[in-house]
Amino acid sequence: MRFVVCLSREGFGEFSTDDLTLGRLYEVLAPSESHDMLRIIDDSGEDFLYPASLFEAVEVQEKTATRLHELLAA
């Protein structure tokens, strides 16, 4: 499991960032084919691709990652 924190909501042309919260932790879903995009479940509850530059990776222990996954999925 991989987690990121949102550090920017700067617009990227066609990408709306209205459903992102600065400072919020998001779980990265299946890896995208493009290394500069991340698929996350945003604040709307739907999964979308966002530019990776809006986020910073967060390293957590496996036990913590499992608990975060369960909490974010609820």
Regions found by a protein language model. Give the residues of each.
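Basic/aromatic-rich interaction segments and small domains that mediate binding to polyanionic partners
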Residues: 3-5, 9-54
